[in-house]
Amino acid sequence: MPITLDPEKLAIVMKHRFQYKICRECGAKNPPDAVKCRRCRSRNLRPKRFRKK
């Protein structure tokens, strides 16, 4: 089901799809406020990227 341009629905989708961090060493998903990776304990985290087509 495609998302229309309703700003409230779009904000909810963006929060759930892009508001977390990815570990650069093991690739695990982590919460947005994480300092260390939950799986490998590395501090090398990056925010999830948003790419427009």
Curated annotation (Swiss-Prot):
Q: Which SMART domains does the entry mention?
A: Ribosomal_L40e (SM01377)
Biological-process GO terms, alphabetical: translation
User: Which key words tag this protein in UniProt?
Assistant: Ribonucleoprotein, Ribosomal protein
Q: Which GO cellular component terms, listed alphabetically, does the Swiss-Prot or TrEMBL entry include?
A: ribonucleoprotein complex; ribosome
Please give the InterPro entries that the UniProt record associates with this protein.
Ribosomal_eL40_arc, Ribosomal_eL40_dom, Ribosomal_eL40_sf, Ribosomal_zn-bd
One Gene Ontology molecular-function label: structural constituent of ribosome
This protein's source sits in the domain of life called: Archaea
- Pfam families from the entry? Ribosomal_L40e
Q: Please tell me whether the keyword Ribonucleoprotein is annotated for this protein.
A: yes
Record keyword Ribosomal protein present: yes
Q: Which family does it belong to?
A: Belongs to the eukaryotic ribosomal protein eL40 family.
Protein name, as recorded: Large ribosomal subunit protein eL40
Q: Organism source for this protein?
A: Pyrobaculum aerophilum (strain ATCC 51768 / DSM 7523 / JCM 9630 / CIP 104966 / NBRC 100827 / IM2)
Q: Which gene encodes it?
A: rpl40e
